[in-house]
Amino acid sequence: MRFTGIILILISMTLIDSFFEMKVEATGPQTTCQAAMCEAGCKGLGKSMESCQGDTCKCKA
């Protein structure tokens, strides 16, 4: 029964993660997104980079 509970928790975490997009925003005086920093931040979250525009870095869900 515990194993089934763990599986249900993992599945629900995966589904919730797929509905909410993660955003990584660099702090500091920079006003433009740097692709290398954005990609490194997304990799730190275990995701790949989706886009880097303006001052917003988006990671793929």
UniProtKB/Swiss-Prot annotation:
Q: What is this protein called?
A: Potassium channel toxin alpha-KTx 18.1
Q: Where in the cell is it found?
A: Secreted
Q: Where is this site: Penetrates into Kv pores (more deeply into Kv1.3 than into Kv1.1)?
A: K60
Its family?
Answer: Belongs to the short scorpion toxin superfamily. Potassium channel inhibitor family. Alpha-KTx 18 subfamily.
At the top level, the lineage of the source is: Eukaryota
Q: In the UniProt entry, what is the domain comment?
A: Has the structural arrangement of an alpha-helix connected to a beta-sheet by disulfide bonds (CSalpha/beta).
Q: In which tissues is it expressed?
A: Expressed by the venom gland.
Q: Which GO terms describe its biological process?
A: envenomation resulting in negative regulation of voltage-gated potassium channel activity in another organism
What are the disulfide bonds? C33-C52, C38-C57, C42-C59
**General function of this protein:** Reversible blocker of both Kv1.3/KCNA3 potassium channels (high affinity) and Shaker B (mammalian Kv1.1 analog) potassium channels (very low affinity).
Alphabetized, the UniProt keywords read: Disulfide bond, Ion channel impairing toxin, Neurotoxin, Potassium channel impairing toxin, Secreted, Signal, Toxin, Voltage-gated potassium channel impairing toxin
GO cellular component terms attached to this protein's record: extracellular region
User: Single GO molecular-function term?
Assistant: potassium channel inhibitor activity
> Signal peptide: which range, if any?
1-24
